[in-house]
Amino acid sequence: MARSFVDRELFGLALAALAIAACAKDPGYKNAGTGGGQLGGLGGTGGGGGGQPADSCADPQPWSEPAAPAACADTAPAASGAVGATIAVDAGAAVGAWNRFYEKAVAVDHAHTLICTNYGRNAANALRKAHAQAGFQYARFHGIFNEDIGVYREDASGVPIYDWSRLDAVYDAVVAAGMRPFVEVSFTPNALASDPSQVQKLLWYNQISPNISPPTGAADDWGKWGALMTAFVQHIEERYGADEVRASWYFEVWNEPSWMYGPGDGGYWELYKNTVTGLLQGDPGLRVGGPAGSAGETPSMIRMLITGALNSGTKLDFVTYHRYGDDNGLPVADVKDAVAFHASVQDIVNTTVAKNMKFTGEVINNEFGPSWMPDISRDNEVAASYIAKMIHLLGTDPTVPAPAAYGYWAVSDLYEEIYTGTASAYRPGNYGLMLKGDPKIPESFDVAKPSFNAFRLLHMLGDQQLGVTGGTAGDGVGAAATRSSDGSAVQVLVYNHVDGGAADSSAAITVSLTLNNLPFTGPIRVRQYIVDRGHANSYRAWLAMGQPPRPTQAQWVTLRDAAELCYYETTATPAGGTWTATFPQSIYGVALFEIRAAN
């Protein structure tokens, strides 16, 4: 989440009130926060894990690898009218490595989502699909120390009791998906909270809002918090391997500290310092960072964190921030402002703060999307071109270092952060890359949105970046080109994005694409994949069937099929290593051309 704190808090209070009123009448609701395994024994010895908690609701069928795209059933769209944009690619020489920073991380709402949600499904298979088809490597989520995970409580004498059973189930799901946790250390267990009433109602998880007050209510609470951090590290290293956790996991302290602290407040520094101390007592080699600031708080928080760390010698390996397409009152899906914001963060890190004490850690945005709140742009084709343009500009600007990761929020509509009690199987405007589906209809599970298909196209790009010229200045057509490291294929990604999400997506620009110095002799095979208003678009298919809130099984099959990528295939014989094509590029559309030798 990432607009102003006041806007978010007021909106969250209103939604929480609606949710509580609607919950009892909602047949799709399941309170996943009350079940689970037994708490462990005294003194931090309990809850060894193993098996699924009692409140698990995994999909009934085993996971299977998704099928590769097939040929489209219709013919490719034909260009008409004058050429509005030209693109030229030099396929003969790489200009550098293609940066896959956008595959580093994706979000999964809150931790319990990977065990169960109010809807009767969990997000584990969505995570598997995200890794298999889009290449995502890390999963980040809120609330690993929330009450619904149940890690921490105390006996009558105040002795800590740890139960790792649900925590294990969460991280096991991440690892089973072929991914790693990007650990967000949040929030405060009720038994350690300094203010039991200080909950963040915007994060309304199964009637359990997390406590965001720091653990400083009693003299020994920082000690207990630090001991919890140390025990946490010791446990996960025993379960997943010390070398693996130390070398490959990230540990991020908190999420959007402005919920608790003002821009000039040193409270977050105390939280960071004490949390990191506890984590590093478990293993001094861990990778630690923060502050995961929203757009408004990021500059001051990052300055404070880097300055404090460098002056005190406190470990800080990376800094994180959040930025959405409509932050600061902008219309949705604004790319240019988000790109400029990343440049400003890099400036803070590399110049403003550093000066004589250079910070060399990673800079990561682990929450981005076309909007900070639910919006229809997240379901339709607008998100697809927004993602493509964002990644292209961030990854190819020679004047600003690309982020180490740029994580989309979030992987699935199995999402409870702003749950209003509706039991609709298709609730438009939600955050996910995939629809939540109907728990009774397997054909409905994890149907892709255009946004997810944009990431699939990005995943199909090669490892070596090629030089590209042309396109339109500012809004409109842009392109990135790559080739496979073994020279077997050349890929060109073309998008047409207009900031604001309000342009007519049925309109198109005729594009002339020329590839020079192709490394193939003889005929070539060209496959064109399209994501736009009329291709790989479950939302437009849903509109066409009358917007049913609970699609039938047959309708879900239609939606699933409409969401799938397909390709148009042609063959050609380049003249002197040059191939040219003319095609229509829809506004808010993305196309990928894959060129290989025909034999």
Regions found by a protein language model. Name each.
Residues 2-5, 16-80:
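Ser/Thr-rich, Pro/Gly/Ala-heavy low-complexity intrinsically disordered linkers and tails
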Residues 550-599:
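C-terminal beta-strand-rich structural cap/linker in extracellular carbohydrate-active enzymes
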Residues 474-542, 588-594:
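Carbohydrate-binding surface patches
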Residues 57-135, 277:
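N-terminal carbohydrate-binding accessory modules
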Residues 367-500, 504-506:
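Aromatic/acidic polysaccharide-binding cleft in carbohydrate-active enzymes
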Residues 134-336, 347, 351:
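Substrate-binding cleft and catalytic face of glycoside hydrolase catalytic domains
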Residues 126, 326-376, 401-409:
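Glycoside hydrolase catalytic-domain groove-lining segments
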Residues 57-75, 116-122, 153-161, 194-220, ...:
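Surface-exposed intrinsically disordered loops and tails
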